[in-house]
Amino acid sequence: MPSKLKKAIGAVKDQTSISLAKVANGATGGGDLTTLEVAILKATSHDEEVPIDDRLVTEILGIISSKKSHAASCAAAIGRRIGRTRNWIVALKSLVLVLRIFQDGDPYFPREVLHAMKRGAKILNLSSFRDDSNSCPWDFTAFVRTFALYLDERLDCFLTGKLQRRYTNREQTGRISTNSTTRSRFNPKAGIKSHEPAVRDMKPVMLLDKITYWQKLLDRAIATRPTGDAKANRLVKMSLYAVMQESFDLYRDISDGLALLLDSFFHLQYQSCINAFQACVRASKQFEELNAFYDLSKSIGIGRTSEYPSIQKISLELLETLQEFLKDQSSFPASSGLYPSPNSFLPPPPSSKDSAVSSSLDFGDSTIDTSERYSDYGSFRSTSLEDLMSRTEAGTSSPPMSCHSEPYGGGRDDPNGNNFDTVSTKSLPNNPSVSASNLILDLLSLDDVSNTAEAEDVEDKKKQDDSKAETFDPWEALMLRDDPKKKIETIEEEPSTAEDHQRDSGNWLLALEETATQVQGNNSMAIVPFGLDDPMPAFQAATDQYNPFLEEPVAQLATAGEPMITFGGLALTGFQPEPTFQVNVPDDFEPSSTPTFKATETLPMKCDPFTTFESFGFGETFSENGGVNQQSVLQEQQIWLQNQKKIIAKHLS
């Protein structure tokens, strides 16, 4: 408790400040400004035993509400008072006065306080404040700082429109009365009516936004808990009681808001559900701290016990249930960021605009997913007569449509790149306004389109057949040659283009065949494929050279006991040359009745142009000493070189 000397010094300071204010304002005209500053100095005196006089508060409120400029003068005066003092009593009384003006004063005052703080006034920014008037200053200094932080948060809520109601001291105590004055812009006795909607009338999004600010403000209120010697101080208790009254209303608003959110929790958007769950988790911890704060306030005798609300704690089971529900719903694909409501699990009514099919149709080896096609509502509509006419005018053919098409068929890709959508009867609009005449026109247009599509298919098949016939293969030309005297030149050739020169240059087989025909001259040998119209074509390989392995003519080798080699329709006489050596077999040797294996001669399956003439039926020409006759080979090469340029020019032209 301060000594009498300190009380006297404080009284002298207060009187000196009042005299200086009167002199300074009297020189500039005085009037309401002098009265306002004197009332502020008297309300924030150094006397700890004297609380703020309600009559002075009412006078200050009346002056502020009479003129807008007076609100700025009041904020400047309070800023000078707090900035110059090092006494916790003066600082705390100044803060309580600010709170009273916030509750019952002109709405322009909070804005002027903010402007004054931006200009450097230390009204609510008391982070550097320190008490020098007490032997135990930290308890009181901490309370002043936390009280200033609460007012700063309250100012933020009010300026952003998040504060639910303006808490008027007249409605709570009813002790404030004022003399009737004509200068006031509103009647103080009537109070200030709030035009903001009640909590029960707010939408979930607005409610979640405001609950977040209310919880921050409630945290600041809980932080004003006094410690040490400040618990027993009367001025501290009176200041804390004003904060307690606002915390009662904050708790009720938060509880009512959370109850409304939980009632509509399963019908909210997904992000709103997450915000509501976070608010519930924060409220469960905050309500425990608030209950402890109220118990402390009751123990030190702040207010009446009947004024305190009953704190309803949020159960842990409820939080676990909400958390499990959010985990389950997080697995669902969010459509446009919306949370799927329980109604989304029910089958939607059949409609052409709202039908969303997420099934997959299996057509053979390919699977067509129709979920993407029907993901956007209203994107699927039936084909109308106007659409078909517009497509016909544009020159695009419509796909063939059938009443037997698969229901809800997906998109079908044409080999030419056209994307066709299969239309079914289930895709027709379920709208009674559609007349029967429109449906008949649609059916007629569908028939026309189907006929046109069928005609185009027939033309495509003809073109494909023609293209197959036009393709020229030298091997096919050789195999289809059933007449030995028929020449390949009889095959009609299309006029070749520059792009086909390289392809035509590869027809070397024609040149080889022509050369072989010229070399033969008068030979009666002819190359005939096996298995053609002639059942037994002539196969002769007569040569003038001596062959030591052929002692008899080929025709005489075909005896009844010798094996016959048959391939296709051609019968060849197998022969075995005499061996150059013999094995002496004992007389008592008896051969087995049946051999273990039997070797058969093989003939070439294909005519390889790179092999010798023997593969085509020619026999090699051997010399008398068993070597190849070089003269005949050189003769063939000369004939080839003579006709090479002529053949190449003929086929490249």
UniProtKB/Swiss-Prot annotation:
Residue ranges of domain ENTH in the record: 28-165
Xref: Gene3D superfamilies: 1.25.40.90, ANTH domain
Segments for region (Disordered): 170-190, 338-360, 390-432
Keywords: Coated pit, Cytoplasmic vesicle, Endocytosis, Golgi apparatus, Membrane, Protein transport, Transport
Origin superkingdom: Eukaryota
Cystine bridges: none
Chief subcellular location: membrane
Renumbered ranges of motif Required to promote clathrin assembly: 442-444
GO cellular component, one term: clathrin-coated pit
Feature: compositional bias, Polar residues: 174-185, 416-432
Motif (ALPHAC-AD binding): 608-610
One GO process term, biological-process aspect: clathrin-dependent endocytosis
GO molecular function terms listed in the Swiss-Prot or TrEMBL record: 1-phosphatidylinositol binding; clathrin binding
Compartments (UniProt record): Membrane, Clathrin-coated pit; Golgi apparatus; Cytoplasmic vesicle, Clathrin-coated vesicle
SUPFAM superfamilies xref list: ENTH/VHS domain (SSF48464), GAT-like domain (SSF89009)
Assembly behavior: Interacts with ALPHAC-AD and clathrin.
General function of this protein: Adaptins are components of the adapter complexes which link clathrin to receptors in coated vesicles. Clathrin-associated protein complexes are believed to interact with the cytoplasmic tails of membrane proteins, leading to their selection and concentration. Binding of AP180 to clathrin triskelia promotes their assembly into 70-90 nm coats cages.
UniProt cross-references to PANTHER family, sorted A to Z: CLATHRIN ASSEMBLY PROTEIN, CLATHRIN COAT ASSEMBLY PROTEIN AP180
Protein name per UniProt: Clathrin coat assembly protein AP180
Phylogenetic lineage: Eukaryota, Viridiplantae, Streptophyta, Embryophyta, Tracheophyta
Gene from which this protein is expressed: AP180
